[in-house]
């Protein structure tokens, strides 16, 4: 029997989040194992996986030949290969693309639904987990493994942990934390990723953007020194010829409805409104605020005003916790 997702509650911004345990049911795990795993992934993703240590996780992109992302992957070493976490809506097509050249290599690429993905965030998240594991990951050591469990550490928007584990441990954690922690589903983790400026690629936006249009270069997800990988030429051209004119932005404000992934927004131009951008993800918080992650031109004025199409309410730009200056 699969681990049952927790019932949803309205998500909360990181600054006010009580201790919360989340099921990450909208995310999914996949793995590559076998003697050629590292070499194979090195030829497929934007990050330099050969330089990754056991204690690192990276956000990398898997692109098509034109440099457009099938998906982005939260990648870490796992067993004799690698595991990655991506949006569940893109896992199957992403794995289909990744397997295309695998027949020539000693690798096995597969979805992993045996393990459970949990998130822990909010007030004193570290203290709550310290009683349950002998070591927790940190800035210096961002991945820690203990038994069947892998713990990933995230700094933004506030310290939080992603736990990859077996069902028995997931049940144990739920039992131990149930009293002190709120339980929530993956919408809360999504809200934190939006706040952190981590790009969310769902099926509607797969194959649409080069990595730099979603700030991946600012998140350490692209190596410009490594050897060939699928889409490299276009990704390099965007950097060295200044071909990328887009960036990922965080908007906040109000809206009478949540915009969907793939939808555009409207930008105020004097008395008029002009369509702009592509929404990657949006969430309504418990205080009524709407947060939207959107890809738009990278030269937007900081005081620009936006709205969901034809809406009476407005959205404004919020700062991201990282710089886009190279």
Curated annotation (Swiss-Prot):
Its main location: cytoplasm. GO terms for biological process: iron-sulfur cluster assembly; RNA modification; tRNA processing. Keywords: Cytoplasm, Folate-binding, tRNA processing. One of its GO terms (molecular function) is folic acid binding. GO terms for cellular component: cytoplasm. It comes from the Bacteria. It is found in: Cytoplasm. Folate binds at residues 27, 189. NCBIfam families: PRK09559.1, ygfZ_signature. HAMAP family: tRNA_modifying_YgfZ. Folate-binding protein involved in regulating the level of ATP-DnaA and in the modification of some tRNAs. It is probably a key factor in regulatory networks that act via tRNA modification, such as initiation of chromosomal replication. Belongs to the tRNA-modifying YgfZ family. This is tRNA-modifying protein YgfZ.
